[in-house]
Amino acid sequence: MAQGDPSMPKKCTALIALPALKAHWLTGIGTVFKTYIMYSGNPSSYNEENSAKLGEIWNLPFVKGKTKLVLVDALYTLCDKGPQPDPRYKWAYNGLIAGTDPVAVETVSLQILNEKRKAMRGEPWPLSPPPLCVEAADKMYKLGTSQMKEIKIEHFGWKQDLLL
């Protein structure tokens, strides 16, 4: 489906979100909740301090309730300076993150980014700006859970460098 044309998701009865795992210099994280931003009519209104509003895009009438699967490409990820690739911050995570709860998938994605950033610096290295959209999608927009302890994670494959 061509991104940006709001008539496209209107025609669909089901959507699959296929974002890549990456940090974003305007929203902290640029993975799940930015998937449908081009359909919002005003993408720039969701950047920086307004990034907490990204969840409202998932409640637009032509998107709400249609996403049946979120599949994050975490094969080769970006933990800073995104969305443009910067080789200093790319690494082969070699994973896929799948789920039906977009907030849970974004929470797991955020956990992986934060753990990689901590491993790179040897100390906590918070995303900047902070990814306000994750907790807001849970608390304000009721799209799922942002509490890691409530998320059931099933691992398949190797466990080395899992960061979870």
Segments and roles (model prediction):
Residues 1-164:
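Extended, low-polarity segments enriched in aliphatic/aromatic residues
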